Amino acid sequence: NILIVEGNDPKNNEFFVKAAKASCSQNLKNLILKLEPNSKIEIINPARDDETKTALENIKKYHGIIFTGGAMRLNDMTEEIKKHISFASNCFKHENKILAICWGLQVCSVAAGGKVAPGKKGAHVGIASDIEINEEGKKNLIYKNKKIKFTSPAFNYDEVCEIPPGATLLSSDKVNNVMGLYFTSGNSKIWGLQYHPDYEYWQMINLSSARKDRILKNNVFNNEDEFQNHLNFIKEEEKKLDFENRT
């Protein structure tokens, strides 16, 4: 039994379904079923109080919990975002194994006492190049038999700027120091990834193209030509993508 925690609000879910052909949670569910066809998977959204209540009442039946990516920004700290953090905190009270991806990593880090802020060195738009596993990462089960340096789908403007107490940094790249993280909080073990092994590059290209105006407005690229060259770079990387080494 696996519980998937959706990281988007309904409006952003619609956007992801249109651009990436699935919500974050459904996309992840599809991948898990591809890897383990007999998996039993439930999806909840922390914004819906009835769903979180039921999930917490039945928390012991899950073998693992996955917090997905999402388009919200932690420091906006809306009531909905507070519910995501609260749900993570409540999960930590129980013996859980948790995988937290992108937005999920940021939510779980804050819930465990860490801090999140806009990335000092910019953003990942569709791709993270040359993520490097450090010595601690080489010893962690999440990076067992993986390449030491790899490139992966990624999309984030914010980063974990202060890791939770006792957390272990596992990997970094030139944009974000925290790309892979392991920590315990309460009774739970949490593995966090700032990138997206759950997505493919064509989805990142579609999401980037659909957000082009916002990306250019935020000055992530100097002009539209630079943005287009970046998408072309992702298309080239798509040809090299090795599924086994996305994480």
Regions found by a protein language model. Give the residues of each.
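N-terminal beta1-alpha1 cap of cysteine-dependent amidohydrolase-like domains
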Residues: N1-S86, N90-H94, N218-T247
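Amide-donor transfer/coupling interface in amidating biosynthetic enzymes
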Residues: N1-V17, N27-K29, I133-T247
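Short, glycine/charged-enriched secondary-structure capping and boundary segments
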Residues: V17-A20, E79-K83, A112-V116, A167-T168, ...
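Short, flexible loop segments at the rims of nucleotide/cofactor-binding pockets, characterized by
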Residues: I41-P46, N75-T78, A128-E132, K147-K149, ...
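Conserved beta-strand termini and adjacent loop/short-helix elements that scaffold enzyme active sites
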Residues: I44-A47, G119, F155, S172
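Structural motif
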Residues: E57, A100, V107, C161-E162, ...
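Cysteine-nucleophile active-site neighborhood
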Residues: Y62, G70-G137
